[in-house]
Amino acid sequence: MILLILLLSCSAGNKFEKSYYDNGNLRYKASKKNNYFNGDAEYWDEEGNLINEVEYLNGMIHGQWVDYYLSGSIKSIANYNFDKKDGLETYYYENGNKKSETFYENNIPVKNTIRWNIKGEILK
C-alpha cells in the first residue's frame, strides 16, 4: 500500500505531497495546488535512487524535466511548455559527454538531431 502524507506549505496555497514505497523509501515528493501538481516534483526508484525531477504548472509539465542515471549523473534534460516539448532536449552519456541534442517547437522537432559518440566526437 502506498502511503501518502500531505504537508501544508505557507507558500501560495501549495501543499506538499509525499508518497512512499512499501519498503519505506520515498517514491516522490511534489508540490500541489488545487489537486494538481504545481511546482517542483522529484521521483525515486524503490532502492532510493533519484530518477527524475520535473517542473509542473497546473498539472502540466511546464519547465525542465531532468532524468538521472543510477550513478546520479544526468541522463537527459528537456524543456516543456504546457506538456509539450519546447526548446532544447539534450541526452548525455553516463560519463557526462553529450549524446544528442534536438530542438523542439510545440512538441515537433524543428532541426536535425545532432549526435555525438561517447568520446564527444560528432557523428555524421
Regions inferred by a protein language model and the residue ranges of each:
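Sec-dependent signal peptide recognition
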Residues: 1-4
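Glycine/tyrosine- and acidic-biased, solvent-exposed loop/turn segments at the edges of beta-strands
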Residues: 7-124
